[in-house]
From Swiss-Prot:
The keyword ATP-binding applies. One of its GO terms (molecular function) is ATP binding. This is Thymidylate kinase. It is an enzyme of class 2 (transferase). It comes from Ruegeria pomeroyi (strain ATCC 700808 / DSM 15171 / DSS-3). InterPro entries: P-loop_NTPase (IPR027417), Thymidylate_kin-like_dom (IPR039430), Thymidylate_kinase (IPR018094).
Amino acid sequence: MSGTGLFLTFEGIDGSGKSTQARLLAETLRAAGHDVVLTREPGGSPGAEEIRRLVLEGDPDRWSAETEILLFTAARRDHLERTIEPALAAGRVVICDRFADSTRMYQGLSRGDLRQLVDQLHALMIGREPDLTLLVDMDPETGLSRAKGRQGSEERFEDFGPELQQRMRAGFLDLAREYAHRFRIIDGNRDMDSVAADVTEIVLTHLNRTR
């Protein structure tokens, strides 16, 4: 960890409820007296939000897979410099809805086997992993149904369909095994409050152990 801060990320397929759980966790930790920054990727800083609009809206085929990975990495670098690292240096808890693990999955798998390229760019330009990653594991069909029910123009990932959702879920579970020291898997196929209770218990245990 940088300074005394804690860097937490939420990951999962679209429709898994991770964004809701990130928000609920932020509210719970703030109520307990923690100084929390709730952020997201792509985005989380003015420059990164501009890149978000480029990659999530409009025709995805206007970028090659390699160009898209560069855009996501550029957004993450700006987010890291302007939001995440200053907050961690100040001792704050940073909760991020998606981080590099999502790029490893969506760009690394969905547009060809580019995982090695994603990891090389990450090592060169980002150089850090979260302290704790909460994977909200969800049945892919249920997640896709939820995601399709959302309104808005950022439909990029939801357009991938059920087959890719299955691959993404399997890929996230593989990542959880690869980075077992920082991943915690949470069953997202339950009501929101039950999931939130598990999230809170895991995070408070981690905070108590590291502070």
